[in-house]
């Protein structure tokens, strides 16, 4: 019978990769909670309409990349390609989107049908952060400062913050008309097939195209930051003042538009020079019309997402911590007592394993040595009768016979002594 294998573009995570993912998640909890964010968990499966209305019908995500299928009643469902829309749906449905400032973070798997490559999988994982209820530039700046602190807590270096403003519903249409006029005369020798389609329907996305010829022929395209209305210009200036005051370096990138249609005003991306072509590790911005677009109140919001696979590429993978003990049972009659002794040690805070079936002393000692355990605990018939155990120090050498009653205290003292040496 043929082996069943995982789907292309999906991955199994074993240590040390799974350990790195746990570190990314735990660090997120620690940092974001200091800013008042609470953890939220939302479904991975949503109605397709949610993403069509929030992300935009003309985006590559909706047009090409979503995993969409009918359920048994013919309703169109989609595995989430990003987290923000689902978080907004949850806040609206639960009535939390209109209760003042709502600050939440979430994490988990997303799904996009893309060509698998380093740092980009069909199932990928994101850390998602959303703050809903305030239009203020200071919140935008604080979100960026929090993101910077989070990435620093992960130990990441060689990162660049790219910053832009996309204007609002008052000034962006004027800029889009100017951009369409600039793109109107361009032909297929100058723009890729996607950009030829987008230049009228979604011209902003042409600026974000990564195809070299498109970048070359749009190098002199008008800049949206030159067409901001006074309110958007003041908002963007306030964001930059706070970042400057905090000493946070950034680069202005007038071509930064992101891949989702709901962004307005502040938009940003964090890029790394250490992971090749998939250089973006985090990105986000303001989305003041998103909640209203999915049937909620007209409230503003700002947030970001971090790609966990890409973060993991930048984090040093440490070896799994070695266990404190490995129990060796010399006689089958001692297996049950050995298991109970191991249980007592775990309850006292130690990590380690005990055998479940009779094995030779040689194979057990070999396994104990391979595990890297600090102590090998030997339980034979003599020790079983006397209520003792032989403690072999696998790092400092030597061995002692110790009463089982004081074993936890003995191991703790030896571990402390070993740390001090």
UniProtKB/Swiss-Prot annotation:
Family listed: Belongs to the class-II aminoacyl-tRNA synthetase family.
Complex formation: Homodimer.
InterPro entries: aa-tRNA-synth_II, aa-tRNA-synth_II/BPL/LPL, Anticodon-bd, Anticodon-bd_dom_sf, His-tRNA-ligase, HisRS-like_core, HisRS/HisZ, HisRS_anticodon
Primary gene name: hisS
Highest taxon, organism lineage: Bacteria
NCBIfam families xref list: hisS
Coiled-coil segments: none
Molecular function as annotated in GO: ATP binding; histidine-tRNA ligase activity
GO CC annotation: cytoplasm
Xref: PANTHER family: HISTIDINE--TRNA LIGASE, MITOCHONDRIAL-RELATED (PTHR43707:SF1), HISTIDYL-TRNA SYNTHETASE (PTHR43707)
Keyword line: Aminoacyl-tRNA synthetase, ATP-binding, Cytoplasm, Ligase, Nucleotide-binding, Protein biosynthesis
Organism name: Solidesulfovibrio magneticus (strain ATCC 700980 / DSM 13731 / RS-1) (Desulfovibrio magneticus)
A biological process term (GO) from this entry: histidyl-tRNA aminoacylation
EC class of the enzyme, as a word: ligase
Pfam families (alphabetical): HGTP_anticodon, tRNA-synt_His
Reaction(s) this enzyme catalyzes, per UniProt: tRNA(His) + L-histidine + ATP = L-histidyl-tRNA(His) + AMP + diphosphate + H(+)
Intracellular or extracellular location(s): Cytoplasm
EC number(s) from the headed UniProt entry: 6.1.1.21
This protein's name: Histidine--tRNA ligase
């Amino acid at each position: 019978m043929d082996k069943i294998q995982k789907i292309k573009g999906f991955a199994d995570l074993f240590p040390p990769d799974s350990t790195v993912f746990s570190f990314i998640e735990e660090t997120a909890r620690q940092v974001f909670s200091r800013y008042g964010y609470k953890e939220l968990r939302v479904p991975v499966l949503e109605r397709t309409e949610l993403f069509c209305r929030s992300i935009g019908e003309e985006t590559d995500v909706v047009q090409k990349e979503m995993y969409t299928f009918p359920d048994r009643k013919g309703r169109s469902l989609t595995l989430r390609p990003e987290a923000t829309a689902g978080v907004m749906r949850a806040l609206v449905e639960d009535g939390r989107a209109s209760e003042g400032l709502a600050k939440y973070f979430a994490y988990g798997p997303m799904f996009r049908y893309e060509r698998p490559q380093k740092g980009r999988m069909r199932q990928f994982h994101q850390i998602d952060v959303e703050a809903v209820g305030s239009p203020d530039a200071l919140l935008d700046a604080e979100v960026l400062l929090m993101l910077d602190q989070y990435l620093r807590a992960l130990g990441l270096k060689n990162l660049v913050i790219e910053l832009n403003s996309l204007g609002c519903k008052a000034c962006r249409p004027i800029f889009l008309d100017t951009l369409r006029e600039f793109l109107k005369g361009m032909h297929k020798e100058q723009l890729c097939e996607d950009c030829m389609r987008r230049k009228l329907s979604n011209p902003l996305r042409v600026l974000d195209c990564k195809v070299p010829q498109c970048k070359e022929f749009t190098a002199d395209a008008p800049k949206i930051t030159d067409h901001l209305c006074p309110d958007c210009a003041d908002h963007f200036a306030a964001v930059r003042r706070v970042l400057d005051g905090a000493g946070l370096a950034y680069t202005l990138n007038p071509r930064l538009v992101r891949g989702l249609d709901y962004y307005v005003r502040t938009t940003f991306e964090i890029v790394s020079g250490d992971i090749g072509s998939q250089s973006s590790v985090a990105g986000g911005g303001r989305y003041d019309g998103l909640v209203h677009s999915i049937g909620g109140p007209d409230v503003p919001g700002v947030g970001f997402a971090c790609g966990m696979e890409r973060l993991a590429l930048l984090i040093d993978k440490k070896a799994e911590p070695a266990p404190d003990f490995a129990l060796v049972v010399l006689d089958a009659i001692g297996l049950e007592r050995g298991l109970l002794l191991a249980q007592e040690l775990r309850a006292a805070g130690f990590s380690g394993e005990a055998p479940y079936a009779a094995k030779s002393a040689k194979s057990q000692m070999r396994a104990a040595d391979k595990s890297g355990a600090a102590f090998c605990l030997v339980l034979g018939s003599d020790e079983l009768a006397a209520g003792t155990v032989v403690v072999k120090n696998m790092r400092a050498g030597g061995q002692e016979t110790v009463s089982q009653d004081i074993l936890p205290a003995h191991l703790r003292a030896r571990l402390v002594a070993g740390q001090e040496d």
